[in-house]
Every structure is written in structure tokens, then in C-alpha cells.
């Protein structure tokens, strides 16, 4: 199954890290293209990007200082299909990307994504730890499969947007 290319540039204000490309995203070749995925409206609502983008516009996030990547690059129908060694390899590769691209903030799209990366439990929101100098923010997963209500997702995305504005 296909994967998605990273959309990254050095010195971005934010890099968003997903778990891995979903089946639909891999088929259409764009991030967060799954039916019911709320990523793009939440990103706009939080003021992180100045216009409402769609998955087909994913490359444009770089214009707004936002990058996209995944912890595991192999597309699957669900995260349960990811092998333990893929998470281990993904941790190493993501650490290298964060060191190389040096974002101000790295946001993990889903608690499980950060927990697999950091190998520790966490709460949603801003974390006390930094990674290669980047502040770490954990968002609720935007997947349509996540039962977390839209109000909770919106609240954390807005907190991230406010945090980014305070950094400027």
C-alpha cells in the first residue's frame, strides 16, 4: 500500500505528527482524507492556518509554517495493524526529522501517537518535556473513528492555536 510524503521545511512553527496514513489517505495521496476526519476544519477554526483547507491542499500547509508527517509511514486500515518494530523504527526516524527540521512546536495527532513515540503515558495538551528544543502538544485524534466529541477536539486545537500565537 502507498504512503504519503512528508511536507516539511526547516524552522517551521509547527509540525503535526499523525500515527500513519489511513487507507483512504494513501489511496488519494493526501493527508487526513478519511471520511469523518476533522483535521482540516479544526486547524482552520483554531487560527493555525488562515483559510479552510481540504486534504487535497495538504502541500499548502507549508505556506503557513505548518508541516505534516507520520510516526509510521506505512498505510494501514487501522493502527492495530502496525507492528511493534515499525513504531520503534518510526521513533528513530521522527527524532531525526525533529532534529533536522527544528520546529518550534511538535503536535501529536492523538495520545497514542505521542505515547508510542515517547514511550510514556500522557495527558492531552502541552507537555512539560521538549523534543530537540520543540514544545510538545498532544491533541485528541481527529480520526472519525475517535469517539472524543468535537467540542473537546476543538478546545485542544484552539489551545494549540493560542500557544502558537503567544510564541510569536
Range-by-range predicted roles:
Residues 21-24, 74-76, 142-145:
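A short, flexible beta-alpha/helix-coil linker loop
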Residues 63-117:
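Internal catalytic-core helix/loop-beta-alpha segment
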Amino acid at each position: 500500500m502507498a504512503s504519503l510524503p512528508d511536507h516539511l521545511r526547516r524552522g517551521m512553527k509547527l509540525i503535526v505528527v499523525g500515527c500513519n496514513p489511513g487507507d483512504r489517505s494513501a489511496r488519494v495521496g493526501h493527508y487526513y482524507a478519511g471520511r469523518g476526519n476533522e483535521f482540516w476544519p479544526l486547524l482552520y477554526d483554531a487560527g493555525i492556518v488562515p483559510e479552510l483547507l481540504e486534504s487535497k491542499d495538504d502541500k499548502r500547509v507549508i505556506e503557513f509554517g505548518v508541516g505534516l508527517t507520520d510516526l509510521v509511514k506505512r498505510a494501514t486500515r487501522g493502527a492495530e495493524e502496525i507492528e511493534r518494530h515499525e513504531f520503534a523504527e518510526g521513533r528513530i526516524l521522527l527524532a531525526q526529522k525533529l532534529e533536522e527540521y527544528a520546529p518550534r512546536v511538535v503536535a501529536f495527532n492523538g495520545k497514542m501517537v505521542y505515547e508510542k513515540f515517547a514511550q510514556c503515558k500522557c495527558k492531552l495538551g502541552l507537555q512539560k518535556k521538549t523534543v530537540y528544543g520543540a514544545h510538545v502538544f498532544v491533541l485528541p485524534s481527529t480520526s472519525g473513528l475517535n469517539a472524543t466529541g468535537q467540542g473537546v477536539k476543538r478546545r485542544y486545537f484552539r489551545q494549540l492555536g493560542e500557544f502558537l500565537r503567544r510564541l510569536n
